[in-house]
């Protein structure tokens, strides 16, 4: 074997970048649809592309997202929930154009939102009304700060979406009750970050998808709330740091009720 002497740091190493990232894939957002489990999987061997994967009860996994798509949203720049699924129908944000696409089971994705500078995320599907409630971020006016709103998006005919909640700087986490009659969401304003202070709002969902009786039910400038979720019986649960620790709470007629008082953080 011939030995070659080269300056320090200039030799050809057997440890390549491809070798380092080959097994560094990661799993993200997880959703349930009946007995099926869906999740986002980052594929380093495919240029760090994100795809939706489905696992059925028999243990079989299937890549749902076609090759030319990358499931990722740029809402809030940090990103967020980038897909939703109901009855086998997957709605997702594509990273390249930030449009929302609908993909029926076994079918190809078709765009629902127009080719304008709008971003969507945190979607939840309402099959009874054929809507998806989600965050929309409007970047269509150059030089203006992006406008965040909660919108309903027609999952059959598409469009830009109908604005349901607006006026604050940021919105996130729309959550639809199991019976489809109520919607909860989070909102906050500059200069706060969501880990500083957020407001939890709820509203009744009318038959046409519009909202009524919207009201703030918890939170504030010094109370960071996240992960609002409805139980099957219509109770709203959420995490709040009003004690200095992110603990679990339940919304009652008398306001938030502390479920577990611990010097510990709770989150999914």
Task: Describe the residue ranges of each PLM region.
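Residue-level detector of Asp-centered blade-edge/turn motifs that repeat once per structural unit
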Residues: 32-34, 85-87, 126-128, 178-179, ...
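Beta-strand-rich domains and repeat architectures in extracellular enzymes and scaffolds
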Residues: 5-55, 70-84
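Predominantly a core beta-strand signature of beta-propeller blades
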Residues: 5-8, 17, 60-63, 99, ...
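Short loop/turn segments that connect beta-strands within beta-propeller blades
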Residues: 56-59, 104-107, 154-158, 205-209, ...
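Repeat-blade elements of multi-bladed beta-propeller folds
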Residues: 80-88, 130-136
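A flexible loop/linker signature enriched in serine peptidases of the S9 family
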Residues: 41-51, 71-77, 92-100, 114-120, ...
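Generic structural signal for coil-to-beta-strand starts
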Residues: 36, 89-90, 130-131, 181, ...
